[in-house]
Every structure is written in structure tokens, then in C-alpha cells.
């Protein structure tokens, strides 16, 4: 998305549930000309500090309610998305000869769960033919989690949020939930396993966990979609704090 010839770090942004690589990272403005901050704002801020970075925005099908990307709701499990992310980033870094650059992740909502699973997958690669995949784990320096439901969120909250932000939820949403929504349920086995495995590796990374302080307007009622307990669980060495924003406006 943005590359610098003297880049010493790769910053990777990963959107969340029902998001996309453009809209999620575009700041709203009254005149309608939003700033796409990975390109319009972040590079300038880095240059001001004499820091040079490549900024990558990763996109994947995180749809759960509509065919806005020309496809239906994602049927891939979080592990499949994680494998694809590791493969994509490995290929990109090899093509740019930046495989030794440290990686900083910025992950919103479900994107945080995806990043955790991707790092676990990368760490598990021990086959010589794919040793380059493990470089993603080895190169990761830091992670910024934005409103990531590490401990899950009630299904009703996610359904209401999507209804409020997207305007509708499929009639059968609560009867047959998309696999990505299922992953975010409290006490979901897949989510629990991701968290257990991440506890074994997280201390090698610099981690910031950010949670929302403002409730999301869900058509007349306001609610925290991801509470502080889930978005910022207490872990030794992890920095956690709230921001004055709701789940869709970090």
C-alpha cells in the first residue's frame, strides 16, 4: 500500500468483522473526503520522527451479512484465514527483500484474533521447505489490538452491532451463524485454544490492547460491543488502555 526505499520496519493493518481494507482505515470527515490514514497520515507521522516503514493493508472476506464484496458470507474458518495471511505476507516480504524487517501489527476487532492465530501458525512451521513462513513469527516485534474480543462477545451484541451498522442481518443469522461469528462467541472452543496457545508466545512481543470507552448506537440503544475485560485482559507486560471511541471509530 505504501512503501519506502529505506524502510526498516513493516507495519501490517488487519481489519475486523464485516470490515474491508479501505473503509475500516478511512477517517470520516464532514465534507465526505475521508483520510485513508495508512497512506495519508501514518507515513507523514513516521517521517516526522525520521522513521521509515512499509505500510501494508491486508484484506480478507470477513463478511457475515451481505454480498458487498461480490461473495457471500465467509465460509472459511479462522485457521484458513490465518494460513492465507502468513502466505501472503511471506510472499510480499520475499518479493521486496524485506524478510529481515521487524513487523508491527495493527489489528481491529476480529483482525486481532486472526493475527494471533497467524502467529501461532507461523511459529508451528518446522518443515524445511517452509522455513520462510516461520519468519513472520520471528520478525514480529509488536502488536496493537483495537477492540479485539480476546475473551469473546455475546452473540446478541454482535448481531445488534451488525444490524445497527449494516442496516440488516440475515433472517437466519441466529439459526445458522457464520463461522467467523461463531469464533467470537464466549466460551468458543476455537477461541479458547487460540488464547491458550498465544499465552505461550505473547511475551516476546510488545503488545498494546485498546478498548472502547464509548457505547455504540444500535438503533436507539447504546451498548459496549466489546467490554474492557474482553478487549484488554490483564497480562504481565501488556499495556492496556481505553480511548474515547466506539467499536467502529478507533
Predicted segments with their positions:
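Short, surface-exposed "cap/lid" segments of acyl-processing enzymes
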Residues: 1-52, 122
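Aromatic/acidic cage segments in peptide-binding pockets
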Residues: 26-35, 73-77, 158-175, 232-236
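Short coil/turn segments at secondary-structure boundaries
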Residues: 23-29, 68-72, 117-121, 155-161, ...
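C-terminal catalytic-base region of ester-bond hydrolases, centering on the histidine
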Residues: 11, 19, 54, 63, ...
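Serine-dependent carboxylesterase/thioesterase catalytic core
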Residues: 15, 65, 79-195
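Eukaryotic intrinsically disordered and solvent-exposed regulatory patches
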Residues: 1, 41-42, 89-93, 101, ...
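Conserved alpha/beta-hydrolase
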Residues: 46-65
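Short, conserved loop/helix-junction motifs that constitute active-site signature segments
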Residues: 5-6, 47-49, 134-138, 199-203
Amino acid at each position: 500500500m505504501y512503501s519506502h526505499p529505506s524502510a526498516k520496519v513493516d507495519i501490517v493493518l488487519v481489519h475486523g468483522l464485516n470490515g474491508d481494507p479501505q473503509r475500516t482505515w478511512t477517517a470520516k470527515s464532514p465534507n465526505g473526503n475521508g483520510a485513508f490514514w495508512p497512506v495519508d497520515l501514518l507515513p507523514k507521522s513516521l517521517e516526522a520522527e525520521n522513521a521509515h516503514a512499509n505500510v501494508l493493508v491486508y484484506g480478507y472476506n470477513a463478511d457475515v451479512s451481505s454480498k458487498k464484496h461480490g461473495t457471500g458470507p465467509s465460509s472459511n474458518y479462522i485457521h484458513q484465514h490465518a494460513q492465507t495471511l502468513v502466505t501472503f505476507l511471506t510472499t510480499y516480504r520475499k518479493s521486496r527483500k524485506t524478510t529481515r524487517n521487524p513487523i508491527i501489527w495493527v489489528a481491529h476487532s476480529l483482525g486481532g484474533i486472526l493475527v494471533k492465530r497467524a502467529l501461532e501458525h507461523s511459529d508451528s512451521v518446522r518443515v524445511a521447505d517452509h522455513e520462510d513462513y516461520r519468519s513472520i513469527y520471528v520478525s514480529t516485534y509488536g502488536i496493537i489490538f483495537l477492540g479485539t474480543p480476546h475473551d469473546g462477545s455475546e452473540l446478541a451484541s454482535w448481531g445488534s452491532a451488525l444490524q445497527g451498522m449494516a442496516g440488516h442481518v440475515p433472517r437466519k443469522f441466529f439459526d445458522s451463524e457464520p463461522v467467523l461469528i461463531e469464533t467470537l462467541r464466549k466460551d468458543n472452543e476455537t477461541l479458547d485454544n487460540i488464547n491458550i496457545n498465544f499465552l505461550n508466545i505473547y511475551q516476546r512481543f510488545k503488545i498494546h490492547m485498546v478498548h472502547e470507552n464509548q457505547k455504540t448506537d444500535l438503533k436507539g440503544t447504546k451498548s459496549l460491543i466489546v467490554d474492557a475485560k474482553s478487549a484488554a485482559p490483564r497480562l504481565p507486560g501488556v499495556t492496556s488502555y481505553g480511548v474515547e471511541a466506539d467499536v467502529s471509530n478507533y
